[in-house]
């Protein structure tokens, strides 16, 4: 994550919103992901340095929350809920069909970089089989 002067200003303004700088970890991870498409090892280092933390502390947050991607994602990112209820309502079949159609596995990206897929947890399983795109 090579930082421009503008990026530094944005990151500093994010940090300044919080009484304790470490509270800015998640917003900074969101910012890094918005720049690079995913959270890179370099962005972990930059965030840790800006917050006076160990890289392991920032990495722990980035790996705990599933919204932070650790590798490249496609231009179109598709998530399919495969929790028990959604699986019963067709989530597994939908996911398997997508994998077969696209020729990729979970967290995979098509060769052209256009589409990536992943398992998600929708928390709305009682309502319908949940699929999300470009979140």
Language model region names:
Residues 41:
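N-terminal Rossmann-like NAD(P)+-binding subdomain of aldehyde/semialdehyde dehydrogenases
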Residues 78, 85-101, 130:
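Iron-sulfur (Fe-S) cluster-binding segments and ferredoxin-like electron-carrier domains
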Residues 25-29, 79-81, 130:
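Short beta-strands and strand-loop turn motifs
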Residues 56:
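Key DNA-contact positions within bacterial/archaeal DNA-binding proteins
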Residues 1-38, 46-49, 60-68, 93, ...:
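Surface-exposed, interaction-prone regions with an acidic/low-complexity signature
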Residues 128-134:
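Conserved small/polar residues in nucleotide/adenosyl-binding loops
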Residues 60-80, 103-124:
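Immediate flanking context of iron-sulfur cluster ligation sites
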């Amino acid at each position: 994550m090579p930082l421009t002067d503008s990026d530094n200003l944005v990151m500093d303004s994010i940090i300044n919103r919080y009484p304790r700088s470490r509270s800015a970890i998640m917003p900074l991870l969101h910012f890094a992901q918005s720049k690079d498409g995913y959270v890179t090892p370099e962005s972990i280092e930059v965030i840790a340095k800006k917050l006076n933390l160990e890289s392991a502390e920032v990495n722990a947050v980035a790996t705990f929350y599933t919204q932070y991607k650790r590798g490249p994602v496609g231009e179109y990112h598709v998530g399919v809920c495969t929790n028990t209820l959604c699986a019963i309502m067709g989530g597994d079949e939908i996911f398997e069909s997508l994998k077969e159609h696209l020729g990729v596995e979970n967290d995979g990206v098509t060769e052209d970089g256009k589409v990536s897929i992943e398992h998600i947890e929708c928390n709305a399983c009682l309502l319908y089989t949940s699929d999300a795109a470009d979140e």
